[in-house]
């Protein structure tokens, strides 16, 4: 083949390939246009699959175009149908106590930003349980921790945080501002109450659903104060015990019945109880029982029994000869249902609790009768009604070589059980006045719940080495 023929052959081949490429491009364009109009003419997409749960609804859309499948998950919050808590169940049988939570706040605070607190407690709602306490508005390592031994200041607030964590500026929720508090959930929303202001003219602000609803002025001009642990609600009615007046003489105590943060009724204290402070309350069988502190006379604890539906109450003293306040005298040979058992020094009292359920009754107290050290649980059948009732079982919670403090009751009323399981917490106070080498006074928390099994004892003390804070 001569050179001219080669050129002609190569040119013809190139032209042929160019034409083929052009035809392929035209065909591809036409195919895309055709597919586009074909998809546009398709019938409406079928109703997406809906996967529903109690709390959310998940919608799954499957859209297929050009052999590509796009799956879109849309999560919609479903309005939960909540109802008011109803205290119809009895207390569960308890043969011992199992550990629920321990926050180790002081140990962690040696090297972390942990808030200075006191007067802690736990309270539950339909989603779970949270820890609460009155913050001092500073951290353990902060310079403002000096002077936090004092109970009342403008810097205190009721805070809450996830159970088991240590409270820090980064994980707490501010419930309300004040130096005395209570809080409870009615099944629909939470009510929190805080007292603040000067000793001679304090006031309470009642919050419901995250908003302030009601204000209550002082009625005796002497440190208006409340429970320092959770209140309890039944069918929307949430009774709260408040006291205004002397800590070492006759004071004015009221039981105030709230619904959605609004006052429904106010009762003056009636019955045999002579002095009421810092009540620890729980509910079962449509009755609320509050075990309180007589800071004036009694080493036996006052008991207020509340009918939340009728909005009425009675009061008396724990009948058992097992005394549970601190300070206290030695246990007498017989208890007293109608009057305080006097004696004990140097401290006039401490917040405490009991679960009073006939043969299934348990009392908590410090192991030391003179100071807030150690903690024990005693099973005392018929402690509420029998002056001869004594302990038949015993469990150490904190050994007597370690500090304890306030204690109180709480129950997860929304747990899926046939009964309400009793739970309690113990405040583990560290710092001043007993440990004066540091400037602060604060606490950690341990919480336990009832078990039908017979479990062993252990000491759940705070465990922080104060020397590390120097």
Curated annotation (Swiss-Prot):
Top EC class, one word: hydrolase
Alphabetic keyword roster: Calcium, Disulfide bond, Glycoprotein, Glycosidase, Host cell membrane, Host membrane, Hydrolase, Membrane, Metal-binding, Signal-anchor, Transmembrane, Transmembrane helix, Virion
Region feature Head of neuraminidase, mapped onto this chain: 91-470
Cystine bridges: 92-419, 124-129, 184-231, 233-238, 279-292, 281-290, 319-337, 423-449
Involved in apical transport and lipid raft association as annotated region, ranges: 11-33
Glycosylated residue positions: 51, 54, 62, 67, 70, 86, 146, 201, 402
Record field: catalytic activity: Hydrolysis of alpha-(2->3)-, alpha-(2->6)-, alpha-(2->8)- glycosidic linkages of terminal sialic acid residues in oligosaccharides, glycoproteins, glycolipids, colominic acid and synthetic substrates
GO biological process, one term: viral budding from plasma membrane
Chain positions covered by the region annotation Hypervariable stalk region: 36-88
Major location (coarse): virion
Virion surface side, ranges: 28-470
Subunit structure: Homotetramer.
Additional note from the record: The influenza A genome consist of 8 RNA segments. Genetic variation of hemagglutinin and/or neuraminidase genes results in the emergence of new influenza strains. The mechanism of variation can be the result of point mutations or the result of genetic reassortment between segments of two different strains.
HAMAP family assigned to the protein according to its UniProt record, in alphabetical order: INFV_NRAM
Free-text comment about domains: Intact N-terminus is essential for virion morphogenesis. Possesses two apical sorting signals, one in the ectodomain, which is likely to be a glycan, and the other in the transmembrane domain. The transmembrane domain also plays a role in lipid raft association.
Protein name (record): Neuraminidase
Protein's gene: NA
